[in-house]
Structure formats: C-alpha cells, structure tokens
C-alpha cells in the first residue's frame, strides 16, 4: 500500500494499514479502494494538503453509507475520516493540464465498536 511517488494510479488495498501518496503518472483520476475484514471500519488520516483548489482535489467516500457520505478537500491542516463499514475509497482528481501535486493519506483498520 505504499505508493509514495510511484506511477501507481489507484488500486485495491487490503492491508491492515498503509499509505496512499502522490503519483507521477499522467492519469487525471485515480481511485484507491481500501477493504478491511468484515466487522472493521477504516480510519483515514489526510496529512496537511496544499492542492490547487479548482484544479485538483481528494475525495474520500464511505462505500456503504450512501452517495452523500463523502469528504472532498483540496487544502487544510489535515483531516481524519472514519468510515462506517469496512470499505472506503480515496480518489485524486485533477485537470488534465495541471501538474500533479503531492499528498499523503495514512489508513488503518479498527474493530467496528472501537474508537479511533
């Protein structure tokens, strides 16, 4: 799950914990799907962001909580997102003429009843 500076654009991550980091590919939309064991939820820690708002963003979506349950960010001091179930997605999207910026997201799983 460590994609730091790689050409990996998205993928399916089943690790208990790991990193999703900026990529250097030409692709403008990358989606990482994170899946934990049943009975677990996912904690995502988005480290401080400095993306170019209006040209690129990160979106975190809880796959089983409905279409309106997501976080979309382009800048800030950092965010923590907790899924309600064991599957979540992280999407990086940018305009085709805009260079990719760096970002780092740490994720890990915890049992459903536990607090982050």
Swiss-Prot record:
GO terms for molecular function: heparin binding. One of its GO terms (biological process) is single fertilization. InterPro entries: CUB_dom, Sperma_CUB_dom_sf, Spermadhesin. Glycans are attached at residue 50. SMART domains: CUB. Disulfide bonds join 9-30, 53-74. Keywords: Disulfide bond, Fertilization, Glycoprotein, Heparin-binding, Methylation, Secreted. It is found in: Secreted. The residue at position 85 was identified as a methylhistidine by mass spectrometry. GO terms for cellular component: extracellular region. Residues 9-110 form the CUB domain. AQN proteins mediate the binding of boar spermatozoa to component(s) of the egg's zona pellucida by a carbohydrate-binding mechanism. AQN proteins are secretory components of the male accessory glands being coated to the sperm surface at the time of ejaculation. They possess as well heparin-, serine-protease-inhibitor-binding capability. Belongs to the spermadhesin family. This is Carbohydrate-binding protein AQN-3. It comes from Sus scrofa.
